[in-house]
């Protein structure tokens, strides 16, 4: 029987999913393997009738540059009991599968490791290689290397953000944007930097003080006042949704928003418009202060996850897909495929990235100590400093409370 590989996609979509799947398929087909695509992520491996598709070369070529994921995705994460009671070992043995390729985030990678260990215990060892994916750019790849999909999502987000900024200048309004990023602020920061937004708020900025609703609002108010002093009655702020994940339960209650929570205890941010929440809080504060300004909310959410992949990610994802075969041919397993800026392929072992205490892969955060971040704060952001206190008194009696550095407790 011809040897086969199985490939699945887990978690949420990101631009480049189909490029990875298509590139993996093309490479292995040329080497004589059968390529089996699994729909619904890991769900199919834990029931007797998985939804599968044999991917041939024309199909791989057809999906290569399409947005979304040809293989339907799922966030299903099996319990330990599922392995003993529901795992479809017959799928692997009947199809002579030698490699499981998983495309997703850290949860998808961890489950792949569990499956490989389970199959080894059942005397049917297979290789597993993971392709790291997230528009949040928060997987701990070597410095300067993005996760695939991030650059495309940033590009599409910036298209919207640029148009919004032009609208702000044209109409004399402010806009409050919210960008995805549960654990890290890479997407919000990247979009804000690209579009020269006068205020960017990400969770990493609160390294010396607790994140509160008041501080988030005051940062935007600081920018509004500073711009007025500069003679500009318009502007835009982009805020990472990750600030909500860092808020205490008490602070979330203060926001007045009633969240539902997922099984892991995280507020289900996808069910509400974060931009609307932020905008309402800001509108309330400017009204209390008597500052004349209109603001409008814009959510940078699900619509950027399935956008057409830009050239950067088309190339990068192709290299990742081809790199999977290189690592497999070298006998590598239990690893993520990594491609450096020169196109060199190497493995990153999940065991080396995991937190030794929790076993989880920690997120890569925005480096607020970097020259890049500092230059954005110093040259692009507009916010109150001590030099503005006197001029700011025409808008607020206590301008020091809206001092950018004091809000964040930065020296």
Where are the language model's segments positioned?
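Short, ordered loop/turn segments at secondary-structure junctions
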Residues: 10-12, 33, 38-43, 75-76, ...
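Glycine-rich oxoanion-binding loops at beta->alpha junctions
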Residues: 46-98, 108, 135, 145-155, ...
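Short glycine/serine/threonine-rich phosphate/pyrophosphate-binding segments
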Residues: 14-24, 45-46, 82-86, 106-114, ...
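Accessory alpha-helical/coil subdomains and C-terminal extensions
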Residues: 35, 91, 99-104, 110-125, ...
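N-terminal phosphate-binding or glycine-rich loops at protein starts, especially the Walker A/P-loop
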Residues: 1-49
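C-terminal non-catalytic interaction/assembly regions of soluble proteins
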Residues: 251-411
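Gly-rich Lys/Arg/Thr-decorated short loops/hinges at beta-loop-alpha junctions or inter-strand turns
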Residues: 4-7, 63-75, 133-145, 170-172, ...
